Regions:
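HotDog/MaoC-like acyl-thioester-processing domains
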Residues: 95, 106-161
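Short connector loops at helix/strand junctions that flank enzyme active sites
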Residues: 20, 32, 52, 64, ...
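Catalytic strand-loop segment that frames the active site of acyl-thioester-processing enzymes
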Residues: 20-52
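Alpha-helical membrane-targeting segments
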Residues: 1-20, 44
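Hydrophobic residues positioned within well-ordered beta-strands of beta-sheet architectures
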Residues: 35-37, 85-87, 101, 125-127, ...
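Short structured motifs
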Residues: 20-25, 85-91, 112-114
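Hot-dog-fold acyl-thioester-processing enzymes
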Residues: 44-66, 79
Length: 161
């Protein structure tokens, strides 16, 4: 389903798995080529080390590459199924304050995905996510592998991935 940046921002803000973990979409860039996300430290996501629970950090990174590629490609006429295929995470420092990250998808990445979808029908690529605390300290590095494929002839589009 194609939606505006503002509508998806508010939908994601109140999506229960993100809301309950205090994961807050600050903004989607024009045309869904970027997203800025804040992970707020709270009593609901604190671990015994007084830092943000690793599962919360992982959950924060999970949906966004898939959402961005889905919205970008739908706007360009593609009928696709998109999801996160795999992820790796390295906790570099404890997240003792709020964490922040930004994802940007370049025009080159979009063009590459379009070309591969037109010729092969399936696009798989790994992308980095770096999370920083409020002081600019690098706390987390992730690699998210996005999987995009054309819908099969008899396959119906769903809201979920």
């Amino acid at each position: 389903m194609v939606v505006s940046e503002k509508v998806l921002k508010w939908a994601m803000r109140f999506y229960p798995p993100l809301l309950s973990q205090r994961i807050w979409v600050q903004k989607f860039g024009k045309g869904f080529t970027s997203v800025e996300v804040k992970v707020s430290k709270s009593i609901l996501n604190k671990n015994y080390n007084d830092s943000i629970f690793g599962g919360t950090i992982f959950a924060a990174a999970d949906p966004f590459y898939a959402l961005l590629f889905d919205q970008i490609l739908q706007r360009r006429g593609f009928k696709v199924r998109v999801w996160l295929k795999s992820a790796q995470i390295q906790y570099l420092k404890p997240g003792r304050t709020n964490l922040y990250f930004k994802i940007n998808i370049s025009e080159e990445d979009i063009a590459e995905a379009e070309q591969i979808l037109k010729t092969v029908g399936k696009y798989v690529k790994a992308f980095p996510i770096e999370m920083y605390d409020k002081n600019g300290q690098h706390c987390v590095s992730l690699i998210n592998e996005v999987y995009v494929r054309n819908l099969y002839a008899d396959e119906k589009r769903t809201i979920a991935y």
